[in-house]
Amino acid sequence: MKVMGIQRNCQQWWIWGILGFWMLMICNGMGNLWVTVYYGVPVWKDASPTLFCASDAKAYDTEVHNVWGTFACVPTDPSPQELGLENVTENFNMWKNDMVEQMHQDIISLWDQGLKPCVKLTPLCVTLNCNAIKNNTKVTNNSINSANDEMKNCSFNITTELRDKKRKAYALFYKLDIVPLNNGSTDYRLINCNTSTITQACPKVSLDPIPIHYCAPAGYAILKCRDKTFTGTGPCHNVSTVQCTHGIKPVVSTQLLLNGSIAEGETIIRFENLTNNAKIIIVQLNESVEITCTRPSNNTRESIRIGPGQTFYATGDIIGDIRQAHCNISEEKWNKTLQKVKEKLQKHFPNKTIEFKPSSGGDLEITTHSFNCGGEFFYCNTSNLFNSTKLELFNSSTNLNITLQCRIKQIINMWQGVGRAMYAPPIEGIIMCRSNITGLLLTRDGAKEPHSTKEIFRPEGGDMRDNWRSELYKYKVVEIKPLGVAPTKPKRRVVEREKRAALGALFLGFLGAAGSTMGAASITLTVQARQLLSGIVQQQSNLLKAIEAQQHMLQLTVWGIKQLQTRVLAIERHLRDQQLLGIWGCSGKLICTTAVPWNSSWSNKSQEEIWDNMTWMQWDREISNYTDIIYNLLEVSQNQQDKNEKDLLALDKWENLWNWFNITNWLWYIKIFIMIVGGVIGLRIIFAVLSIVNRVRQGYSPLSFQTLIPHPRGPDRLGGIEEEGGEQGRDRSIRLVNGFLAIFWDDLRSLCLFSYHRLRDLILIAARTVELLGRSSLKGLQRGWETLKYLGSLVQYWGLELKKSAINLLNTTAIVVGEGTDRFIELIQRIWRAFCNIPRRIRQGLEAALQ
């Protein structure tokens, strides 16, 4: 009995050991992590794609052709969407922003294209005989005398329609546009004739700025910093995503920034390096200051033919008083504004005195406030604006204006580059324009003395990039990376669609889950992927309409070319992502498990740390150095899987025996059979011929082909008797050599018999093999069934044992509890009886004592 118990215990331990081993293997397998591909994750990186424009060009004057080419832009969105990104911090750098460079090149190209069809003024590089203008009106205003000095009445010889004929023409030129040939002489020439070519702006080209919205192509996004005190560089904690910027007016000006955006809070000082006096300082005001500029002279314009098909527009006469152009600014508002700027600068230089002074010198465009007003280019002296002495004496109760004396030029040095100039045709009538000063461009003087207590700031400008930078400081373009990889436990399994029910996130933008954890963001993949594709389709439709609108033009504008580029770029981005998904075997899937094991060297963080605490942006930075390695492993894994599937498909042809009887297979069998038979017959013929040739060489001469030779009879038959005329013996005879057909028949018969015997043997072997396999399979099934029954009985036995043990445990517990209860009750009874017997015992004691 003891031996039987030991044997049973050993058997049980063996079974439990196997079960424990398999449980350990399953748990170990479940602990592995595998690479999972996600499409539509909110991840981005800095990028420099080609941007396209949107504008409401139709809302402006259609009679003139604006040089900005906004008629070729897509229409603006009437309800632009701006999506805030919670828990997102992004670094911005306005001084290294590709959007600024791109806008700068676009404006240059637009100016060049706008002036291409216009007239070249090379024929005007002739000697000009100029005299002062005679004013018939008697006035004593100093501004008139100043205006008289500003313009000259010039005569010059010009070519007519016939090149060999010349005639004299008269025109008024500004003094800034001509230079004397000799000192004290009345002979002049145009100022740019010896340095650059001059192109006259087309008369119907408008230079008035129209707001331009820069938009990112599909697959990209524009991030916007909404911090009110953002200085242009560093981290921004209030970030949103937009598809287009706000309307930016391409105002070309120096010293003062006009018609831009104002700061929402306090005045902001933006600089790249304040200690470097060569760097510009951009000031954004929180309140705009109105500046009103006018050219009071009522000018007329006349056209002068300077050659076949060429017309030069010049100032013909000035009707009424000749007064100098000027600008007016409210002294109270300006001084308050300058005082705010001074206070902001004082924070950066706490122990020094801040002073403002006029420009120290340079080109006219830099030393003055240059801008375009109604088609004329004004150059205004800002000495009265930047004057610290007047600022200290300022009385806030005054309502006076600061007047800036302005000069006008018609020959403009093109700010786009050196060696090019533009002639602005004169504008008829009185010119007046109102603008808003929204910012300043300043530079700091270098410290001439080491212990100087003053910091001097002067107005500056000239680099139009700073003008665009003052508006684009809060934007940056990023490329959306919808593909993400992360470790998960499942390995190449398909998640059922019913498990991804409605998520209630249909109103989230593509990057709306950027600040969420990876686990929360992965829920919105369907919405984000759908919005990515719909955004591509919508933008492609808008761009195509804008391109079709330009078909009547012989040459696309800058915007048309950029629209084509962005159209191609968006499609390339989408196709590239889809190609990667296809290479990895994840086409059409938002969450795609793979068979690539996760390497802990890529990231050793746990599942909870990754999915519950990290955003997709943080995770992307975590594994950015290993992304290429993971992508290569995904490709290798998919190639191996494709190879395995190909091998499996090759085996599937033999999966069904009925495929053997397919007509195409039988045709293949017949071809093989015919080749085998033909080969055997050919070999027999060759060997027969070789045998005959060999015998002939040995001297053998065959008998007649019809000679019969007797076939030996059997030993049980007697020979015939000729004399008695008995029956002749029926001896069998064979031919010595058969004919070709007979030989072919014998060979074919032998081959068929050989094939029959071999096939019969093969069928018998196959039948025997199938029989053995059937018996083995039957035995295996029987053993499996017995094993299952044994396992079932084992489970049943242990279930009964556990049931009995539980019953015994309950019985024992009940007995123990019952006995304990009885003993407790008995103890209580004894105590109660003893308590009740106390009087009796006392009485009995007293009785005993009294007796």
From Swiss-Prot:
Ranges in the topological domain labelled Extracellular: 32-672
Gene Ontology biological process terms from the UniProt entry: clathrin-dependent endocytosis of virus by host cell; fusion of virus membrane with host endosome membrane; fusion of virus membrane with host plasma membrane; positive regulation of plasma membrane raft polarization; positive regulation of receptor clustering; viral protein processing; virion attachment to host cell
Swiss-Prot/TrEMBL site (Cleavage) positions: 500-501
Glycosylation sites: 87, 135, 141, 153, 157, 183, 194, 238, 259, 273, 286, 298, 328, 335, 351, 381, 387, 395, 401, 436, 599, 604, 613, 625, 662
Signal peptide (residue range): 1-31
Sequence segments annotated as region (V3): 293-326
Region called Fusion peptide, residue ranges: 501-520
Transmembrane segments: 673-693
Region described as V5: spans on this chain: 449-460, 451-460
SUPFAM superfamilies linked: gp120 core, Virus ectodomain
Coiled-coil ranges per UniProt: 621-655
Residue ranges of the region described as V1: 130-153
HAMAP family hit by this protein: HIV_ENV
Domain comment in the entry: Some of the most genetically diverse regions of the viral genome are present in Env. They are called variable regions 1 through 5 (V1 through V5). Coreceptor usage of gp120 is determined mainly by the primary structure of the third variable region (V3) in the outer domain of gp120. The sequence of V3 determines which coreceptor, CCR5 and/or CXCR4 (corresponding to R5/macrophage, X4/T cell and R5X4/T cell and macrophage tropism), is used to trigger the fusion potential of the Env complex, and hence which cells the virus can infect. Binding to CCR5 involves a region adjacent in addition to V3. The membrane proximal external region (MPER) present in gp41 is a tryptophan-rich region recognized by the antibodies 2F5, Z13, and 4E10. MPER seems to play a role in fusion.
Protein name listed in UniProt: Envelope glycoprotein gp160
Biological source species: Human immunodeficiency virus type 1 group M subtype C (isolate ETH2220)
